[in-house]
Amino acid sequence: MPPHVAQGGTVVKPRWYSHGLNRLGYYRLARAAAAVLPRPMRLAVARVVARGVGRALPAERRRVRANLERVLTGASPRELDAAVDDTFANFGAFFADLLMLNRADPARLRRYVGERAGDEHLEAVFAAGHGAVLVTAHLGNWELGGRLLACRGGAPRTHVVLSAEEDAALERHLRVNAPELRFVTRSHPAATLGLLSALRRGEAVAMQGDRPTGERGDRLVSFFGATAAFPLGPFVLARAAGAPVLPAFCTMARDGRYRVDVGAPIWVKSGEEMAGLEAMVAALEDAVRAHPTQWFNFFDVWAPPVDRS
């Protein structure tokens, strides 16, 4: 039974990591400080600050280290400590970019992309008149990934599905719709029907696929040698729309530019949703193994925290 299902069978919602700084006022203050620096210096300062913050958060540091122990098998204690430091530093760099780029014209974002791989998969799907469900994870700069998809020349409209922020004002600030880009809150009652219609029009839907929802659609899948819960919903949606699922990740290279990787389409037939989920988790495992210090989960992924109140 998934760890977020109570013993009596009652489904409880996972409570993911959150903190009191996730408020618009703090974001505006951080953005004002970041805006005075050129990007290379801004990222460098953000890495230093985030590395220091990580060392002041022992509980979060322990969780990140435990997650990385499963990924970096055979790593020494010193190597694991360095990887934890790098994880916090990378999170700071991506946050600095989010502050400056979240309201930018999607077309302007192309200058930040150094390499793309797998665009041919998307082009073939769209050319055939299908929509596409792009499933990503909390790996790299996932917030920027949806915007980068929208700025592809000739791409159809992209609908980015995200969880609601605790601060509604912050959500309005971070997620600004554009003609080619629309943000959808997962909890909205009409969200699924709207996404289904968009896919049937040949548009793209981008969503997270690495955290369970706490609902009965979650399934346990082998992930780095142990079972973890993942949502089946993206594959149910794709099957209903007759659209494929494509793994998609936006990571940062050493030169500070982003690399966008889109995997081969996973077509989902009726009754094969679980097989599709397993294929997606295998792709996620490969991506995390390639970029372990760009994987941002500050809790035990194999036993996510729950709210039993």
Model feature map: region roles:
Residues 3-136, 171-174:
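Membrane-anchoring hydrophobic helices of lipid-metabolizing enzymes
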Residues 26, 60, 117, 141, ...:
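Residue-level preference for nonpolar/small residues embedded in alpha-helices
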Residues 62, 163-168, 227-229:
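Active-site metal-coordination segments of metallo-dependent hydrolases
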